[in-house]
Amino acid sequence: MVLLAENKDEMIANFKLHDSDTGSPEVQVALLTHRISYLTEHVKVHKKDHHSRRGLLILVGRRRSLLDYLRKKDIERYRSLIERLGLRR
């Protein structure tokens, strides 16, 4: 399912650090994870859609960069986020 405004607001509410938080690494990673899971299912069905596959790889790289940044800055926040999102690592 595509990320609708209601879903996006709900995800931001679940991962925000303070009231006006929309850009913290936790929020960004959560939104990217949702988009990645959607694109993963799309690519499984449409195997020849290389354009979407490339977009998926770009998103995975962006999420990896944010997670690496968070791990360097605050390991406890990183571990908490990984556990909440159910990511491997």
Curated annotation (Swiss-Prot):
Keyword flag ATP-binding: no
Coiled-coil ranges per UniProt: none
Top-level taxon: Bacteria
Cited function: One of the primary rRNA binding proteins, it binds directly to 16S rRNA where it helps nucleate assembly of the platform of the 30S subunit by binding and bridging several RNA helices of the 16S rRNA. Forms an intersubunit bridge (bridge B4) with the 23S rRNA of the 50S subunit in the ribosome.
UniProt similarity note: Belongs to the universal ribosomal protein uS15 family.
PROSITE patterns per the UniProt record, alphabetical: RIBOSOMAL_S15 (PS00362)
Example GO biological process: translation
The protein's name in its UniProt record: Small ribosomal subunit protein uS15
